[in-house]
Curated annotation (Swiss-Prot):
GO terms for molecular function: ATP binding; catalytic activity, acting on a protein; proline-tRNA ligase activity; transferase activity. The keyword ATP-binding applies. Homodimer. It is found in: Cytoplasm. The gene is proS. Its main location: cytoplasm. This is Proline--tRNA ligase. It comes from Clostridium botulinum (strain ATCC 19397 / Type A). Belongs to the class-II aminoacyl-tRNA synthetase family. ProS type 3 subfamily. GO terms for biological process: prolyl-tRNA aminoacylation. One of its GO terms (cellular component) is cytoplasm. Gene3D superfamilies: Anticodon-binding domain, Bira Bifunctional Protein, Domain 2, C-terminal domain of ProRS. The lineage of its organism: Bacteria, Bacillati, Bacillota, Clostridia, Eubacteriales. The keyword Nuclease does not apply. Catalyzes the attachment of proline to tRNA(Pro) in a two-step reaction: proline is first activated by ATP to form Pro-AMP and then transferred to the acceptor end of tRNA(Pro). InterPro entries: aa-tRNA-synt_IIb, aa-tRNA-synth_II, aa-tRNA-synth_II/BPL/LPL, Anticodon-bd, Anticodon-bd_dom_sf, Pro-tRNA-ligase_IIa, Pro-tRNA-ligase_IIa_arc-type, Pro-tRNA_ligase_II_C.
Length: 478
C-alpha cells in the first residue's frame, strides 16, 4: 500500500501550488509529455482520446448544420497575410516564418499558419460568383502555430490542435445568426459533454478578434478562480471579403461582398477539464468525454472463475459503454489509485463473493460512492450511473462558479475582491476603453465578456463613476 500512497503523494496539493498541481496531473494521468521543442507537447493516448471525443461531437454537429471538411496548406505567403491590416497586426508577434527551403533562401517568406482566414479567402475568391454559390460552410481540423512567450501544456502551446470554421453568407443577418448558432453549439459541447458551465457573451472591442466586427465567446471559471476562454465565434462582416476581393452577383444582378464568420475550439478544452473538475487525487473525467468510461477490476483474480466472469462482464458492457478490463497482476489497491488518478468515471469491482451473489460493486470517481448492482441489470445500471455522474459534476461545477462570482460597484470593491476572492467579478462599464485599460493596469483583470443575459448591478461604471452601459464579467485569465 506504500506504493499506492506514493502514487497520489506525487501530486502537489492544488491549494499549495495550483500551477504545479496542474502540471503533475498532465504528466501523472499521462495526458501529455514535453517535447524537445519549447512550447510544444506530445499528446499521449489518454489526452488524444479526449480530443477525439470532442472531435466526434463537434464534427457530427457541423455536418448536421451542412458544413464540409477541407484541408488548407500549412504555409501562408507573406503577401497574402498582409492583405488584411488589422488581422496581420493582431498576429504578427506570434508568427513563425520559414525563410529557407533546404539551403536556398526563399524569394518570399512563408508564415506557418497561426490561423487560416487568408487561405480560405483566397480560395473563396476563386469559387464564388453568384448568390447561388452561397453560403459556403467549410471547416478544417488541423494544428496551428503561434510563437508564445509563456507556455503551459494544453492551455498555451506553440503548436496546438483545433477546428477552425470559415463560412461566407449572402447577408449580414444570416452570417450573424450562423455565428451565434455555432456559439450555442460550443456551449452545449461544454455543458452536455464536458460538464462545464459557461457564460455566453460578446467581447468588447478591445478583446475581439483581430479584423472582426464582433466576437462572441464562452467563458469558464477554473478551480483557482481564473477565467478561461473556452471557445469563440466571430462575425467578420465584409472586411476580409473586401480585402480579398470576394464578390458575388446578388439577386438583383449587382456585385456585393459576402459576410464572413469564423470560429474555433482547441485542445485547451482538455486543460479546462483538468482545472474545472480535478482534485488532489488526480484527474476527474466527465463520462461522456472520457476515452474509457468504466474500468473493471477483478478482486482475488487468482481464484477460480473470477477472471472468466470479469471477461464476460467486459464483453457485455462493451456493447453500451467504453470499458476496459485490467487483468494485470498488480494489486487491486494500486489499480484503484491509478484509475482514480487517470480520472476514469466509474470503477467496477468483482470478486468471488460478488460472483456468488450475482452482483458487482460500482465506485464513482467523482464522489467515491459505492453501489451494489445485480449482474442481470448491470448494462442499464452502468449507463444510468454515468448519466448521474455527469449531472452531478455539472452541478458541482456550477455551484463552484456561482460561489466564486462576485459583484463590485466601485474600484475599491473591485480591487479588494480580485486580490482576496479570485473569480468572476460582475461590474458595470461605461463603454470607454480607457476604463477597461485602467482596470487591467490596476488589477490585472480583463473584460471576459458582456453576457447575453444582462442585469443591472449599479447605475454607474465601476471605474469612472459615469453612467453605465453594460454589465461585464471581469477576471484574471489564462
Amino acid at each position: 500500500m506504500a506504493g499506492d500512497k506514493k502514487f497520489v503523494e506525487d501530486i502537489t496539493p492544488m491549494d499549495e501550488d495550483f500551477a504545479q498541481w496542474y502540471t503533475d496531473i498532465v504528466k501523472k494521468a499521462e495526458l501529455a509529455d514535453y517535447s524537445s521543442i519549447r512550447g510544444c507537447m506530445i499528446i499521449r493516448p489518454n489526452g488524444y482520446g479526449i480530443w477525439e471525443n470532442i472531435q466526434k461531437y463537434v464534427d457530427t454537429k457541423l455536418k448536421e448544420y451542412g458544413h464540409e471538411n477541407v484541408s488548407m496548406p500549412i504555409f501562408i505567403p507573406e503577401n497574402l497575410l498582409q492583405k488584411e491590416k488589422d488581422h496581420v497586426e493582431g498576429f504578427a508577434p506570434e508568427v513563425a516564418w520559414v525563410t529557407h527551403g533546404g539551403d536556398d533562401e526563399l524569394a518570399e517568406r512563408l508564415c506557418v499558419r497561426p490561423t487560416s482566414e487568408t487561405l480560405f479567402c483566397e480560395h473563396y475568391a476563386k469559387i464564388v460568383q453568384s448568390y447561388k454559390d452561397l453560403p459556403k460552410l467549410y471547416n478544417q481540423w488541423c494544428s496551428v502555430v503561434r510563437w508564445e512567450k509563456t507556455t503551459r501544456p494544453f492551455l498555451r502551446t506553440t503548436e496546438f490542435l483545433w477546428q477552425e470554421g470559415h463560412t461566407i453568407h449572402e447577408t449580414k443577418e444570416e452570417a450573424e445568426s450562423h455565428s451565434l448558432k455555432i456559439l450555442n453549439m460550443y456551449s452545449r459541447l461544454c455543458e452536455d459533454m464536458l460538464a462545464m458551465p459557461v457564460v455566453m457573451g460578446k467581447k468588447t472591442d478591445k478583446e475581439k478578434f483581430a479584423g472582426a466586427d464582433d466576437t462572441y465567446t464562452i467563458e469558464s471559471l477554473m478551480h483557482d478562480g481564473k477565467a478561461l476562454q473556452a471557445g469563440t465565434s466571430h462575425y467578420l462582416g465584409q472586411n476580409f471579403s473586401k480585402a480579398f476581393a470576394i464578390q458575388f452577383s446578388d439577386r438583383n444582378g449587382k456585385l456585393d461582398y459576402p459576410h464572413y464568420t469564423t470560429w474555433a475550439v482547441t485542445t485547451r478544452l482538455i486543460g479546462a477539464i483538468i482545472m474545472v473538475h480535478g482534485d488532489n487525487s488526480g484527474l476527474k473525467l466527465p463520462p461522456r468525454i472520457a476515452p474509457t468510461q468504466a474500468v473493471i477490476i477483478p478482486v482475488a483474480q487468482h481464484k477460480e472463475g473470477v477472471l472468466e466472469k470479469a471477461k464476460e462482464l467486459k464483453e457485455k458492457l462493451a456493447k453500451v459503454v467504453r470499458v476496459k478490463l485490467d487483468d494485470s497482476d498488480k494489486m487491486p489497491g494500486w489499480k484503484y489509485s491509478e484509475y482514480e488518478m487517470k480520472g476514469i468515471p466509474l470503477r467496477i469491482e468483482i470478486g468471488p463473493k460478488d460472483i456468488e451473489k450475482n452482483q458487482a460493486v460500482l465506485v464513482r470517481r467523482d464522489n467515491r460512492e459505492k453501489t451494489i448492482v445485480s449482474l442481470d441489470e448491470i448494462e442499464i445500471k452502468v449507463q444510468e450511473m454515468l448519466d448521474i455522474i455527469h449531472n452531478s459534476m455539472l452541478e458541482e461545477a456550477k455551484k463552484t462558479r456561482d460561489e466564486k462570482t462576485y459583484v463590485a460597484t466601485n474600484m475599491e470593491e473591485f480591487e479588494d475582491t480580485i486580490e482576496n476572492k479570485p473569480g468572476f467579478i460582475k461590474a458595470m462599464w461605461c463603454g470607454d476603453r480607457a476604463c477597461e485599460d485602467k482596470i487591467r493596469e490596476v488589477t490585472g483583470a480583463t473584460s471576459r465578456c458582456m453576457p447575453f443575459e444582462q442585469e443591472v448591478v449599479s447605475d454607474t461604471c465601476v471605474c469612472c463613476g459615469k453612467k453605465a452601459k453594460n454589465l461585464v464579467y471581469w477576471g484574471r485569465a489564462y
